[in-house]
């Protein structure tokens, strides 16, 4: 029979202290936590959880209760049993804000929990958007005011347990062009249409962007780093092999499934205290690094 890995938690809990990591205290972005919207009016904020406190995401959600906020949009995927961010959405709706949530009911293993949250959200007056044909895996939170808006885009789930144990990026911004894109994404979801975006990418658009970027690096001075949980897309793997064969340095950080290896490609799996969860792709592009973040793994079903 397969090994029951849940027993490892019990084993470590009952074992000697040297089996356990010392207490961990994340860095707290104090200025952001004090007034996230005020700081975002001045500059963008990029955090890497859990080294930088996931509480920043929950504090951003609580900013939806501010007087100047008129409307809130959010995606919820793996909610968990207790979720301050979801509670903030409920509180905002009860305070009279227009709150719209895309609650993905097909998150594997969390279907019943998400159904419970669905009932709570609806009772509070939140508009829960109809599920589109395709699973929505994007992690986006949008706050709209009379003057403009603020957006959060992340690689991780809006889930406090995950937020303290998974490595993930969070980008917070008030840039008008990004806010407009996130708003267009949510509007398309509400109207059950395919999003037409310029800055952001979804589905097949992610694959096209990655393929173009990889092939652009297919020369002796090329340099690229890809980090995913799963890297199984045949087209992308073929492009990586081609770039490496043309002399590019290709580094892969893949936590779980990698379906093709090549002598010219460096591939590693990071195993440590936290679960590697951030997905990122970096390309040097002639000296200037371009970095893309995504919540999606490089798998055919996701593209």
Predicted segments — roles?
Residues 233:
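Glycine-rich phosphate-binding loops at beta-strand->alpha-helix junctions
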Residues 225:
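Catalytic grooves of carbohydrate-active enzymes
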Residues 1-222, 242, 246, 256-303:
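N-terminal localization/anchoring segments of enzymes in phospholipid and broader phosphate metabolism
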